[in-house]
Amino acid sequence: MPDDRMFTDAEALLVTRNAQSLEHPGGTLLEHLRRVGEQLADWGASREVQLAGLCHAAYGTDGFPVSLLDLEQRGTLRNAIGMQAEELVYLYAGCDRGQVYPQLDQAAACFDDRFTGLRTQPDRKSLRAFVEITAANELDVVRNSSALAAEHGLRPRGLSQ
């Protein structure tokens, strides 16, 4: 990941919210978040997508219900990583995976926000960013949890880096 103030501020915020103390496949949540951000950087994702990947679990997710920040604190994250990256974090966190994932092979997808119940249709750029963050997240989880990989019929060592 690029070495600049926003990445430093984002990681400092995650540390103040104890991400380094929460267990996650492959170590701690903070380690997972770093790996997701690094994977996105390796893939050449935009700076905003990398920042969103680094912070993707800030509000919890459909698969990881622990939140580091309350939704009322969106401004705190926005100040650290910028508006566009924070909006991607919210999109990722608010995603009802069971509703959204089956649509990801389509040019457009409707998202039911699990926080508000509202339905939205992200623009193509946001949808692409969501898919990139999702792929980086899921790859990291199965690489670091043989039980989850086996549950989904995957062999983590066989996944491309």
Locate predicted features:
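Divalent metal-dependent catalytic cores for phosphoryl transfer on phosphate-bearing substrates
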Residues: 16-23, 29, 36-158
